């Protein structure tokens, strides 16, 4: 009994040290600090969008695209045996004027589950702005997971809940300067939505010219956080370019978009913080709640004047975080309010983030993924890219009526996210003026039965559907919902892509526990503890693993942890 207590105490101390490790700092997915102003051309107002807006002057002739898929085939990826996973990656030049290059990593659908030609093509974009979509490859929706917790871990197992089991997954680092994407000179970095849309559209055109077999498949765009701003603009741009298709251009078969914990309508979402903090979570009290009315009014005044980069709006969220702490506890983690963090989540050591940083900056890895020409090291987020986009608090909601008239839209929110919380999302969805406003208001709530990682049935969440719009409140989810709820998030995206009802049982649409077991990363049970929010289960399992390893590995008076 005493041995068990000592072991669990050791695990607890080590877990706390790991959770406060400063390595691999996670930068805010939405940076509410004061952003650097720029004298460069502003983002055009929606009222100034004209035909010229859709005349992509950067669009080069696709006849100049000479590469083939084999030029991008990933072979000998360090840490993964050949033949286990097929992927393609590299850089495409989408703006010849600035030598702007976007990095991508493409994972065709898993042939053991679905024929890639029978699956849709799904783009994934992380937010920031300026944060790399490679996070999703290694931590969220992608197939690669590091084994072990060492920063130098270079062995992978395949994520059994990877979204490439339902779709051909295309991860893009955008805009320029994000992740492994680059421009030759920082003057070529983008400053507005128009440039982002043009470069994204050009990228897809070139990608389909090279990977022509996929060009007619159903096309979807997904992402999280600030991608909730990107995606409506990109989808609207594609719809309009399809209507005015230029010579040699490929019509993109856009069928839908999926936005997770998106920053889409700041006017409402910022205003929701006090309701969420007081009524939905209880992380602030009555006194703080009363103080927010004045803070919100100051922010709304700035937004009404077209100032989408104000201290007043940043102050609303920062005050919420400050008020969530006390003299005895740290403030809550902005991405998961079950956790406390002195930096509110900015230093949250996501499982795999340190390994990702080391791995993507290795020369042999850069060579394998065809990114040796990228002149800078990979970082999760780029503050320069973030600072040049000064319209981050501008709404994208006005685009939704057009989108909902043409494509399907899935909006989902992790239950425990603060920064892009479900209260704000629910409120802005109710503000959309479209042909089915009344049907949306009257739509009954559904209770979604999903599948757990062990194959058992569990509640996935709640939501509602009317016409082309679906909203899901994902139980157990954080800001990075696919990270900590892999099975239910896979169930969710599969239903959306197949256009299946959330009222159906998962087995009825072919979703079951995968047959491939997930190996257990063995370093002190830390990954388990972090993934489930530091609960006692992680400590107990971690302690059991340590005890077994110590029993088997004791030699010459010391213990060694074996992976």
From Swiss-Prot:
The lineage of its organism: Eukaryota, Amoebozoa, Evosea, Eumycetozoa, Dictyostelia. Keywords: Carboxypeptidase, Glycoprotein, Hydrolase, Membrane, Protease, Signal, Transmembrane, Transmembrane helix, Zymogen. Its EC number is 3.4.16.-. It is found in: Membrane. Residues 551-563 are cytoplasmic. Probable carboxypeptidase. It is an enzyme of class 3 (hydrolase). It comes from Dictyostelium discoideum (Social amoeba). It is a single-pass type I membrane protein. Residues 24-529 are extracellular. This is Serine carboxypeptidase S10 family member 2. GO terms for biological process: proteolysis. Glycans are attached at residues 31, 95, 110, 213, 244, 328, 382, 468, 499. The keyword Transmembrane helix applies. GO terms for cellular component: membrane. Its main location: membrane. InterPro entries: AB_hydrolase_fold, Peptidase_S10, Ser_caboxypep_ser_AS. The chain crosses the membrane at residues 530-550. The active site is at residues 225, 417, 479. GO terms for molecular function: serine-type carboxypeptidase activity. Belongs to the peptidase S10 family. Residues 1-23 form the signal peptide.
């Amino acid at each position: 009994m005493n041995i068990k207590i000592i072991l669990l105490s050791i695990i607890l101390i080590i877990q706390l040290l790991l959770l406060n490790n400063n390595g691999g700092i996670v930068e805010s997915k939405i940076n509410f600090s004061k952003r650097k102003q720029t004298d460069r051309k502003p983002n055009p107002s929606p009222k100034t969008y004209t035909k010229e807006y859709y005349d992509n002057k950067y669009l080069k002739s696709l006849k100049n695209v000479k590469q083939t898929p084999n030029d991008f085939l990933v072979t000998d990826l360090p840490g993964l045996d050949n033949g286990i996973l097929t992927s393609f990656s590299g850089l495409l030049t989408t703006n010849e004027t600035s030598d702007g290059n976007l990095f991508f990593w493409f994972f065709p659908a898993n042939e053991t589950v679905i024929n890639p030609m029978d699956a849709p093509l799904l783009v994934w974009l992380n937010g920031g702005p300026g944060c790399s979509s490679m996070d999703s490859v290694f931590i969220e929706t992608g197939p690669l997971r590091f084994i072990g917790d060492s920063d130098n871990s270079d062995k992978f197992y395949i994520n059994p809940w990877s979204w490439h089991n339902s779709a051909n997954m295309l991860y893009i680092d955008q805009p320029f300067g994000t992740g492994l994407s680059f421009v030759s000179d920082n003057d070529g970095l983008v400053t507005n939505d128009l440039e982002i849309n043009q470069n994204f559209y050009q990228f897809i055109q070139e990608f389909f010219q090279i990977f022509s077999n996929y060009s007619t498949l159903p096309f979807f765009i997904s992402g999280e956080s600030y991608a909730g701003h990107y995606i409506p603009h990109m989808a609207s741009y594609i719809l309009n370019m399809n209507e005015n298709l230029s010579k040699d251009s490929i019509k993109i078969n856009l069928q839908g978009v999926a936005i997770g914990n998106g920053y889409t309508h700041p006017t409402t979402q910022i205003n929701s913080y006090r309701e969420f903090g007081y009524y939905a979570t209880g992380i602030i009290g009555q006194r703080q709640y009363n103080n927010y009315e004045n803070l919100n009014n100051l922010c709304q005044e700035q937004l009404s004047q077209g100032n989408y980069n104000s201290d007043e709006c940043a102050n609303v969220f920062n005050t919420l975080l400050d008020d969530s702490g006390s003299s005895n506890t740290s403030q809550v983690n902005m991405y998961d309010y079950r956790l406390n963090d002195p930096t509110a989540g900015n230093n949250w050591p996501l499982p795999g983030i340190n390994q990702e940083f080391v791995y993507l900056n290795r020369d042999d890895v850069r060579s394998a993924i065809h990114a040796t020409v990228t002149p800078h090291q990979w970082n999760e987020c780029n503050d320069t890219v973030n600072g040049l986009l000064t319209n981050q608090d501008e709404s994208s909601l006005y685009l939704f009526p057009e989108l909902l008239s043409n494509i399907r839209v899935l909006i989902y929110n992790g239950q425990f996210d603060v920064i892009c919380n479900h209260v704000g999302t629910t409120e802005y969805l109710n503000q959309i003026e479209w042909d089915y406003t009344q049907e949306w208001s009257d739509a009954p709530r559904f209770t979604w039965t999903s599948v757990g990682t062990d194959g058992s049935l569990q509640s996935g969440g709640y939501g509602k559907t009317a016409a082309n719009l679906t909203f899901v409140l994902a139980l157990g989810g954080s800001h990075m919902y696919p990270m900590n709820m892999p099975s239910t998030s896979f169930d969710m995206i599969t239903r959306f892509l197949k256009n299946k009802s959330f009222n159906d049982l998962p087995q009825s649409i072919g979703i079951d526990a995968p047959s491939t077991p997930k190996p257990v990363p063995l370093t002190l049970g830390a990954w388990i503890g972090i993934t489930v929010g530091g609960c006692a289960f992680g400590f107990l399992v971690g302690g059991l693993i340590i005890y077994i390893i110590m029993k088997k590995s004791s030699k010459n008076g010391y213990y060694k942890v074996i992976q």
